[in-house]
Amino acid sequence: MGQFIKIKVFTDKYPFLGPIIWILSVQYFIVQIIVGVAYKYSYSLRFNTISDLGNTSCGIYSGRYVCSPLHNLMNASFIMLGLTMALGSLLIYQEFRKDRGTLVGFSLMAIAGLGTLFVGIFPENTISLLHTLGASMPFILGNIALIIMSLYLLLPSPFKIYTFVSGVIALFFLILFKTSLYGSFGIGGIERIVAYPQTIWLIFFGIYMTRNEYLKRSK
């Protein structure tokens, strides 16, 4: 127990590549701010979904007015986030003890990344079925991945608790989101409670791995 294996692919000379890739997920939040500010009329964090920022047309969509001049930037951000989730999962997995739990956890996060890729490739007003399928993958699989990794990764107790709680809260609000029980959060607010925790976790986990002794233990 406690045995770590160094990354054998891509990162023998660059051991922080995986964590840095996950830290780059911060671009997702930066781009949302930029695209939201450029939104025609008023973009509401409560009543507009994240995907509205990537909608390629102007007009009424699902009862909401959408018009995002920088939709291409937002969709590129979705694609980049998906790539960082998937590639980072592949690289960082190599740093941990190989067991079924870590394999399943990182695999689910990688698949969630592929789903996020779909969100950017197929904006909500194009092939809605593929967009919805793509969005469901990080919403469901990404948050399940957090719970699994909280149970199997060798992490300090506070970080394990943070990881577990992030996944549980997001899945709870996902149920409310899917049953249209938005309450005072609105559709946009409740969607963000579902979507943001795992992305914030990716950033924090990347920072954590670059600043602690994990990589040193693998020497």
What kind of feature is each model-predicted range?
Residues S42-L70:
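Extracytosolic (periplasmic/ER-lumenal) interhelical loops and adjacent juxtamembrane/interface segments
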Residues I21, S25, M80-L87, I140-M149, ...:
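Hydrophobic cores of alpha-helical transmembrane segments in multi-pass inner/ER membrane proteins
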Residues L87-G113:
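Cytoplasmic juxtamembrane regions at transmembrane-helix boundaries
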Residues Y61-L91:
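Individual transmembrane alpha-helix segments
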Residues D12-S42:
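N-terminal signal-anchor transmembrane alpha helix
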Residues M109-M149:
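Membrane-proximal helix-loop-helix units in multi-pass membrane proteins
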Residues I148-K219:
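Terminal transmembrane helical module of multi-pass membrane proteins
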Residues M1-K13:
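Short, Lys/Arg-rich, polar N-terminal cytosolic tail immediately upstream
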